[in-house]
Amino acid sequence: MSGHQVRNFKAICGKVEREGHATRRFTLVRSVAEQPHALLRAALLDQGWREGDPVTAISDGDPALPALVRSATGGPVEHILDWFHLSMRVQHVEQVMRGLCALEPPPLARLDPAQIDVERLRHLLWSGHHDKACEALGRITGWAKDAAMLNDPAVEAGMRRLAARCAERRSYIETNEGALIDYGERYRAGKPISTSRAEGTVNQLVSARMNKRRQMRWSPRGAHRVLQVRAAVLDGQFGHQAIQLAA
């Protein structure tokens, strides 16, 4: 979000969901919220959460949300990395590989060994085999670096790009290892694996008027207050007349 006193600032938005309970939205600008953990804790308590109950936080990898949840609960929290963001990083590797396969004339080095590993990546991560995914990324990186020495400059650039992408993805997986799960198993159990529903909440709370593309400037405190009102309105905490005024 764009600010008029600082160039930009971060707002945390999310949803608290529990089976059999109405969804509660929460949002805040942490830099100005006096007790940010209290806002989330209130939403958890409203959902029937009690001290010691397990809590799962699904995020895009930003450490701010799981840290806030741990502060609010005062206990351990299962943090899950959103499948969509993880999948997109695999897609970037697949795109580079497809570009290499489409080259004419084809590269001197055979692409089969790397292509097999690239095609396995998504399945390995989906099935919870994160160590095997890292091994595959390591093999692709080594192969691409070696293959770059055998080809013309145009092909070399593609090979080095593939090596760089794979090295970055391996580092990303290793950094977030504690938040990676068997997504297939969780999905089959009917449990969420993505932040997509929460991202819809972001679109509801951070309306067009607060979008940086509208060139409007907000102070962190002003944005924090507006977000609190919008969350309360969307959760039905105000009467009909108040909703008309605040929408």
Where are these regions (language model features)?
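Catalytic center-proximal scaffold of phosphoryl-transfer enzymes
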Residues: 1-247
